[in-house]
Amino acid sequence: RPDRSHAKSARSVAETMGNYHPHGDASIYDTLVRMAQPWSMRYPLVDGQGNFGSPGNDPPAAMRYCITGDALVALPEGESVRIADIVPGARPNSDNAIDLKVLDRHGNPVLADRLFHSGEHPVYTVRTVEGLRVTGTANHPLLCLVDVAGVPTLLWKLIDEIKPGDYAVIQRSAFSVDCAGFARGKPEFAPTTYTVGVPGLVRFLEAHHRDPDAQAIADELTDGRFYYAKVASVTDAGVQPVYSLRVDTADHAFITNGFVSHNTEAPLTPLAMEMLREIDEETVDFIPNYDGRVQEPTVLPSRFPNLLANGSGGIAVGMATNIPPHN
């Protein structure tokens, strides 16, 4: 519901699969993602929070991804806490209310209001040349510096997509000058804030120095917030308990062992609620679901004409039929 706190995407998919669609979670999540994309639907039915792809065919983040309990979550004032210690004794496959200030991708304090213990899953360790490391599930996204057609760009990559030689983004404020790591605003670290510290940026500027957008790209990458650490290895770390946080920002990013992590959430939009309005007031018929445990509606009340407004397409008897979206 749009008037309540956001729900983790994996939870919405799991409940849908358990109650109405026992054929796997991939098609459910793909549908959820599409309903959140304003370039896919004229009137989105899901208010996506996090990485739901882009018009340029960038893929959305995975619905469930987590990190191991030893990951240090960056807090304000240079402090940190093991993610497993945020809620001591959290039960597997549980979500737990918290009230904790953490650092976002820019190093600013933001509110984390939920800790998820996602049970035990296969995990992999990403280790950089400098010795920084983080361990998480194969579909856990980390912010990376990626060469996109010659343009150095910040993009989310899943751990199973990260290879030795890639560059992981490290948040500088997660480290102190009194320990191993990196910091901004200190003279001894100043050279790393210039182009020499951003792989591919010098080559990009040499080729595009007359492009007015080139300076903006360079400014974003060299403003001192990030260090770009070369990945040395990605190795199997067995099966371990994993955790995640819900962060109250647009991209839900938080810092773990210096790496930038994030997740996705998805409540319905107010318009989608009009499709469900008064569904519990005998407006439509209900039948048993696939296993007879709960009831499901045969149709939705649909005060909002979704088929006309958002359009649709299909094939029947060898003929394609398309309904364009209407105002």
UniProtKB/Swiss-Prot annotation:
DNA-binding recorded as keyword: yes
Enzyme class, first EC level, given as a word: isomerase
Note, other: Few gyrases are as efficient as E.coli at forming negative supercoils. Not all organisms have 2 type II topoisomerases; in organisms with a single type II topoisomerase this enzyme also has to decatenate newly replicated chromosomes.
Single GO term (MF): ATP binding
Cellular component GO terms, alphabetical: cytoplasm; DNA topoisomerase type II (double strand cut, ATP-hydrolyzing) complex
Keyword Lyase among record annotations: no
EC number: 5.6.2.2
PANTHER family with a match to the protein in the record: DNA GYRASE SUBUNIT A, CHLOROPLASTIC_MITOCHONDRIAL, DNA GYRASE/TOPOISOMERASE SUBUNIT A
Assembly behavior: Heterotetramer, composed of two GyrA and two GyrB chains. In the heterotetramer, GyrA contains the active site tyrosine that forms a transient covalent intermediate with DNA, while GyrB binds cofactors and catalyzes ATP hydrolysis.
Organism: Mycobacterium xenopi
Keyword list, A-Z: ATP-binding, Autocatalytic cleavage, Cytoplasm, DNA-binding, Isomerase, Nucleotide-binding, Protein splicing, Topoisomerase
Reaction(s) the record says it catalyses: ATP-dependent breakage, passage and rejoining of double-stranded DNA
GO biological process: DNA topological change; intein-mediated protein splicing
Protein name listed in UniProt: DNA gyrase subunit A
Catalytic residue positions: 65 (o-(5'-phospho-dna)-tyrosine intermediate)
Annotated Topo IIA-type catalytic domain residues: 1-327
Pfam families: DNA_topoisoIV (PF00521)
Function of the molecule: A type II topoisomerase that negatively supercoils closed circular double-stranded (ds) DNA in an ATP-dependent manner to modulate DNA topology and maintain chromosomes in an underwound state. Negative supercoiling favors strand separation, and DNA replication, transcription, recombination and repair, all of which involve strand separation. Also able to catalyze the interconversion of other topological isomers of dsDNA rings, including catenanes and knotted rings. Type II topoisomerases break and join 2 DNA strands simultaneously in an ATP-dependent manner.
Main location: cytoplasm
Entry comment on modification after translation: This protein undergoes a protein self splicing that involves a post-translational excision of the intervening region (intein) followed by peptide ligation.
Stated family: Belongs to the type II topoisomerase GyrA/ParC subunit family.
Highest taxon listed in the record's lineage: Bacteria
Localisation per UniProt entry: Cytoplasm
Lineage: Bacteria, Bacillati, Actinomycetota, Actinomycetes, Mycobacteriales
InterPro entries: Hint_dom_C, Hint_dom_N, Hint_dom_sf, Intein_C, Intein_N, Topo_IIA-like_dom_sf, Topo_IIA_A/C_ab, Topo_IIA_dom_A
